[in-house]
């Protein structure tokens, strides 16, 4: 019997390889690592471990597909309770690639290394079950702890980066880096500086601010500092620039799908800069009613992504609405980066619904006296209510 395992090269998925044979009776374990912008060293390490411990290994390049999904996220100002959805958006894509290999190999089942307390189990399994595969989840089904896994790996000669002193679970892709576990599970514990890799400490960031200019076309970032580049290169460059200035750290309490509250630590410099810039450009070109309704759509969109429900028909409908709003979201935005902050300082668009002449205090383009009639009726119902009951 064959099983295809979604494989990151980390502790959880690595111990799943022998467990799938020992506890579940599979003859062949095939590992699949999906490249969505992780560091090259991580991809190489996963390949080496997959080839060493599994019977067969695949590495699939899905960076372009992931960037396309990130463009949609930017247009949706994707954000769940302050989380920029990097891991959540990646999981269904990874699951689809695992399914492709499972079909190719004629596997009887697919597997993942997610725990029974997190969200990823749901994101993976929704896609796996959509394609009719039997799902194996050793970490959840065997009720494993990270300490048990570390000891099991040691006994089986499996080399893993996690230790009992630093039992962190780290997930990284082009959009974000997340760190959880260990002492970080105590919400009163201040995270040590060594958990961060993408971002400088804001206190130690450069004393001189830096301004970046981002060009958008129909809601999609297409140029950085007047240089056109592909999405992958642009996001990677902003991660480096923003990280240098300590931009994009999030330490938050997050409401998981199962109802548990979890402490999460994220790094996402490019995401912070791009969403800040994109939202500001929308404020310039979209009408008040478009902006108001889009906020509701964005909340629903983010929740569907967070819950792993990107195959829900509502998700397609929300995307269609968002795409319609982006037809005029073209222009440029300048963002100042300084010691952890990303602040918009200038913006311009040929579709701006802003008139300097009309809004200026120093012009007579609008006869101010015309506002008198509007002012007489503004708040009328509230005034009538107060007269009746006071």
UniProtKB/Swiss-Prot annotation:
GO terms under cellular component: cytoplasm
Residues reported to bind L-aspartate: 115, 119-120
InterPro entries: Arginosuc_syn_C, Arginosuc_syn_N, Arginosuc_synth, Arginosuc_synth_CS, Arginosuc_synth_type_1_subfam, AS_cat/multimer_dom_body, Rossmann-like_a/b/a_fold
GO molecular function annotation: argininosuccinate synthase activity; ATP binding
Record keywords: Amino-acid biosynthesis, Arginine biosynthesis, ATP-binding, Cytoplasm, Ligase, Nucleotide-binding
Reactions mediated catalytically: L-citrulline + L-aspartate + ATP = 2-(N(omega)-L-arginino)succinate + AMP + diphosphate + H(+)
Domain of life: Archaea
UniProt-listed PANTHER family: ARGININOSUCCINATE SYNTHASE
Protein name per UniProt: Argininosuccinate synthase
């Amino acid at each position: 019997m064959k099983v295809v395992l979604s494989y990151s090269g980390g502790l959880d998925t690595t111990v799943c390889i022998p467990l799938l044979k020992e506890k579940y009776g599979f003859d062949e374990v095939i590992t699949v690592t999906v490249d969505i912008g992780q560091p090259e060293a991580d991809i190489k390490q996963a390949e080496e471990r997959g080839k060493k411990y599994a019977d067969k290994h695949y590495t699939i390049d899905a960076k372009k597909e992931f960037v396309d999904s990130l463009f949609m996220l930017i247009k949706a100002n994707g954000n769940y309770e302050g989380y920029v959805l990097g891991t959540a958006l990646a999981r269904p894509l990874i699951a689809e690639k695992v399914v492709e290999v499972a079909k190719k190999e004629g596997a009887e089942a697919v597997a993942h290394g997610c725990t029974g307390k997190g969200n990823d189990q749901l994101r993976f399994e929704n896609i796996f079950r959509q394609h009719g595969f039997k799902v194996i989840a050793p970490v959840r089904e065997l009720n494993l702890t990270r300490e048990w896994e570390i000891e099991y790996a040691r006994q089986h000669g499996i080399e893993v980066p996690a230790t009992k002193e630093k039992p962190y679970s780290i997930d990284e892709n082009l959009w974000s880096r997340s760190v959880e576990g260990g002492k970080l599970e105590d919400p009163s514990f201040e995270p040590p500086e060594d958990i961060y890799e993408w971002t400088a400490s804001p206190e130690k960031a450069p004393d001189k601010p830096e301004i970046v200019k981002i060009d958008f076309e129909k809601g999609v970032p297409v140029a950085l500092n007047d240089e056109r580049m592909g999405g992958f290169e642009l996001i990677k460059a902003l991660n480096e620039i923003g990280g240098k200035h300590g931009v994009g750290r999030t330490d938050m309490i997050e409401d998981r799908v199962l109802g548990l509250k979890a402490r999460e630590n994220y790094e996402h410099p490019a995401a912070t800069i791009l969403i800040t810039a994109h939202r500001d450009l929308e404020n310039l070109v979209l009408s008040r009613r478009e902006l108001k309704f889009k906020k509701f759509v964005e909340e629903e969109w983010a929740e569907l992504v967070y819950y792993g429900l990107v195959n829900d028909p509502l998700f397609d409908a929300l995307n269609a609405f968002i795409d319609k709003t982006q037809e005029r979201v073209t222009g440029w935005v300048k963002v100042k980066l300084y010691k952890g902050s990303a602040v918009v300082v200038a913006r311009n668009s040929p579709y701006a619904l802003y008139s300097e002449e009309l809004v200026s205090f120093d012009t007579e383009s609008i006869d101010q006296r015309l506002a008198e009639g509007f002012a007489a009726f503004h708040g009328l119902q509230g005034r009538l209510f107060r007269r009746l009951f006071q």
